[in-house]
Amino acid sequence: MVFLIIVVAIVAWVVFAYNRLVSLRNQVDNSWRQIDVQLKRRHDLIPNLIEAVKGYMQFERDTLTQVVEARAKAVSAPDQASRMAAESQITTGLGKLMAVMENYPQLKADGNVLKLQEELTTTENQIAFARQAYNDVVLDLNTRIQIFPTNLIASNFGFKAAEYFKGAPEEQAVPKVDLSMTTPRA
C-alpha cells in the first residue's frame, strides 16, 4: 500500500512538472507572438516613414538604406535568432534616423511625418514592453528546465532552453553626456 502511494505521488509529480513545462513553453511562444504583432506594425510603418522623409533627407541615404535593408532581413529571416538580430539592426537604424531627423526643421513642421514618428515611438515602446515580458517568461522556463529534479523531466521530454531577446550592442552602450557649461570654440 505504501509502495502504491509513493508510485502515485511520483507519477502525479511527473505529470505536474511536465504540464508546468508545457505551460511555460506555450507562454514563451505566446510572448513571442505578442512581440511579432508589434514588429509587424513597425514593419508596416517603416516604408511610410521612409517615403515621407526621403525627399527632405537627400544627404542621409545611408541611414535610410540601413533601415530598409534591416527591415528586409527581418521580414525574410529564416529563424528566430536571425530575426532577433535583424530587429536589433532596425532599432539601431531607426534611432539614428530619428536623431538625424532632428537636423531637418522642415520635417518637424510636416504633420504627416510627426504622426508617423509618434506612431513609431509608441510602437517602439510596445515592443520594449513585449520584449521584457518575453524575457521574463524565458527566464521562468529556462530556470525550470535547469533546476533539479524538473531538469530530469525536461531532458527526457525534449524541452529546450529558450533564447532571450537581446538588444543590439548599440542599445546597451552607455551614452556619453557632456554637462560642461563651456561652449566649443571654432
Language-model features: locations:
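A helix-centric hydrophobic-segment signal that preferentially recognizes long
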Residues: 1-186
